């Protein structure tokens, strides 16, 4: 497992704490007066380094690429959204790590405010954004500080994430005086997009998946876990005679591994992309080996060409490739052909 890298999209939670006065106890349990403190949360979007329109405009510059970019814009903007749909807040006592308070709030905006009440104590606050909205990720171990995780659906192959996932962790010492805290919500997933140019070659279909990305994220210590193996099925769009295979996933490991390829060679990669091209009378499978890690909050675009045999040839020299000609469907990952 690896520590998360603070990259890309960020939201900020500003926390202001003040002693509760008598008027704040109206309509509340009076036994709590003098023991609880009012915590006012302000959730707002601060900046978005991963600006999808800017990245697509910079990377996809030809007329054909711009047509493809118009098809990629909506799904990628949803992943790298500038708003939060919902917020899941957990307050754990320290040092025991037991859950003391839990709240969920619908936001659907870049800015929201609400109030919670906490007793004088040391806490660690863990905040999750969009974890409920994302159907392929579950919140697990929510009753204990060190077990709270974002976990992908357990399966050999899953679809691409559709939402950006954000988390924060904040140590809080509630004392009988006014205080303020600031906690950043960082994006914990990412996305990659393969741009495929078939040229004059007649391609009947394209499918693919992303491999070697994390499956779980431990929120309290900000680490990704890779013990389970799940590949993420890429989504296909087309435009301008080009194909785009995009997938939103968790990040890859930081350190590349060495793989033995089917071409009796070795390749180093932090993550891999599998692509199957259907030609008129055959299938060709290409595995791309990407040595540069895929970071949290990042949108990575890799351009390739499809040659007359259906092989995918990357434009980047540091991306390796191995090819299986006359590949047979079945017995591989469950991807649409």
Language-model features, listed with the residues they occupy:
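Tryptophan-paired
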Residues: 68-139, 204-298, 327, 333-337
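Mixed-charge, low-complexity intrinsically disordered segments
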Residues: 52-80, 136, 140-155
């Amino acid at each position: 497992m690896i520590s998360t890298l603070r990259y890309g999209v960020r939201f900020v939670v500003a926390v202001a704490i003040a002693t509760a006065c008598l008027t704040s106890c109206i309509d509340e349990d009076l036994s709590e007066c003098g023991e609880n403190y009012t915590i006012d949360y302000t959730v707002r979007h601060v900046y978005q380094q991963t600006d999808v329109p800017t990245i697509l405009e910079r990377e996809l510059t030809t007329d054909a690429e711009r047509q493809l970019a118009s098809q990629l814009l909506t799904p990628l903007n949803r992943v790298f959204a500038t708003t939060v749909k919902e917020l899941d807040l957990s307050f754990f006592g320290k040092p025991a790590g037991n859950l003391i308070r839990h709240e969920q709030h619908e936001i659907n905006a870049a800015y929201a405010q609400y109030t919670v009440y906490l007793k004088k104590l040391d806490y660690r606050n863990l905040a999750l954004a969009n974890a409920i909205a994302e159907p392929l990720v579950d919140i697990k171990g929510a009753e204990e500080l060190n077990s709270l995780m974002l976990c992908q659906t357990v399966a050999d192959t899953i679809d691409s994430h559709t939402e950006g996932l954000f988390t924060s962790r904040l140590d809080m010492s509630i004392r009988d005086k006014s205080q303020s805290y600031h906690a950043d919500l960082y994006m914990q997933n990412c996305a990659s997009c393969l741009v495929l140019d078939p040229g004059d070659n007649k391609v009947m279909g394209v499918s693919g998946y992303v491999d070697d990305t994390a499956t779980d994220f431990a929120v309290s210590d900000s680490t990704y876990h890779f013990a389970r193996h799940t590949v993420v099925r890429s989504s296909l769009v087309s435009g301008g005679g080009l194909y785009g295979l995009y997938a939103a996933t968790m990040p890859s490991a930081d350190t590349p591994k060495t793989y033995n390829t089917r071409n009796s060679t070795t390749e180093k990669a932090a993550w891999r992309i599998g692509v199957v091209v259907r030609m008129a009378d055959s299938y060709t499978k290409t595995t791309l080996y990407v040595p540069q890690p895929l970071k949290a909050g990042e949108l990575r675009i890799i351009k390739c060409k499809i040659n007359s045999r259906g092989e995918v040839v990357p434009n980047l020299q540091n991306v390796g490739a191995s090819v299986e000609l006359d590949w047979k469907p079945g017995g591989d990952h469950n991807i649409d052909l």
